[in-house]
Regions:
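Long, contiguous binding/interaction regions
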Residues: 1-84
Length: 84
């Protein structure tokens, strides 16, 4: 069994959120699970955040989605494949 996970780190969430969401929406059929993590609550939201995606489908498309996200200033990605 093999699982592919895309880690997305945003350093300026308020500036990057809309652009990141557009990419994720465009590639939505590849996303099986999405988890967003950031520090803060209510009016004290943090400027950085982590999104963890479990991906399905073609690896070339995974790489392309990661590349498009990496083009956004303040966003860094890491594509991880785990197998057992």
């Amino acid at each position: 069994m093999e699982k592919t996970v895309l880690l997305i780190l945003q350093s300026h969430r308020k500036d990057t959120a809309v652009s990141v969401q557009k990419v994720l929406t465009a590639w939505g059929c590849l996303i099986k699970t999405r988890l967003g993590i950031h520090d803060g609550v209510l009016d004290n939201c943090s400027e950085s955040g982590l999104i963890i995606l479990e991906l399905v489908g073609d690896k070339e498309k995974h790489n392309e989605m990661a590349r498009k996200l990496d083009l956004i200033d303040g966003v860094t990605t890491e594509l991880v494949t785990l197998s057992i």
